[in-house]
UniProtKB/Swiss-Prot annotation:
Region called Disordered, residue ranges: 1-42
Boundaries of every GRAM domain copy: 143-221
InterPro entries per record: GEM-like, GRAM, PH-like_dom_sf
Similarity remark: Belongs to the GEM family.
Name of this protein: GEM-like protein 5
Gene3D superfamilies: Pleckstrin-homology domain (PH domain)/Phosphotyrosine-binding domain (PTB)
A biological process from GO: embryo development ending in seed dormancy
Gene Ontology CC: one annotated term: plastid
CDD domains reported for this sequence: PH-GRAM_GEM
Recorded superkingdom: Eukaryota
Biased composition (Basic and acidic residues): 16-27
Amino acid sequence: MTGSQEDQPKIIIDQEQPKTLETEHQPEPSSSSPDQKKWGTHVMGAPAAPVAHPDNQQAAAWVAGDNQQTQYQPYVIYSPVEHPTTNNPLEPVIGMFHTWSRKAETVARNLWHNLKTGPSMSETAWGKVNLTAKAITKGGFESLFRQIFGTEPNETLKKTFACYLSTTTGPVAGTVYLSNARVAFCSDRPLYFTAPSGQESWSYYRVVVPLANVATVNPVVVKETPPEKYIQLTTVDGHDFWFMGFVNYEKATHHLLTSVSDFQTAHGSVSG
C-alpha cells in the first residue's frame, strides 16, 4: 500500500538564518570523565549502529538521565538554534524550555545545581534529567510532544522513554516519544553541525518515524558485564535506529513492540 506524502522520508531544515559560531564558542573536546560523557555527544552525526563509535557501546550499559556534514538521512529533522553562550552544560537544556516559562528555567538550574554539588551523578539521576521535563513544563509530556513535533489528526501520546540514540559521533541523550501514529526522538540539547552552505550551526536532533514505516523492533542484548542493551528500530525503506540506556529496558521494549504490532494489525484490518 502506498503511504501518504507526509509519511515519506524527508529532512526539514528551518528557514530562519542559522547563527554563526564565533571562534571562542567552538565546541570543546569531549571530556573523558564518565559522568560528563553521560550528557552524550555535542556534535551532530548520522544515525548508526553502535559499533560506529565506542561511546555508543558504553552508553548501552548506562541509564539515561564529526563536525563534518552528514549524509542525507530521512526521518531526521534539523532546526537550527542559537548556540550556547557559556560552558555551563545546562545552558542547552535551558534553551529548550526558555520560551515556555521563566519558572522552567529556575527549575532546570536548580536541577543542575543539585546534580553538580552531589557526591556523584548517579545513573538514576541521569534518567531523571529527561523525565524532569514533565515537572518543568506545565502541560506535561503531551504538551511537550505537541510543541516539538506537532500532531497529526487523532494522534495521542502513549509513552515516553529517556534514552540515547546511537550515531556516528557517539550517543545522543534525549527522549523517545511513542504515540499511536509515530515513534519520535528529540535530543536534550542542541548539537553542533555544519550546514550544507558550510555555515556552523546548532540544532536539536529530532527523528520522526511514522508507525506505518516501521518494519521491525528488535531487542538486542550483548552478554557482557555489564550487559549492553539496545532496541533496534528498522524501517520499510531500509533505515535503522539504535536506542540504548533506557531507565527500564524491558518496559520500553514491551511498549514499542506492542504499539507497532497493534498498529500493523489495525492497518491490516482496515486495508483488508
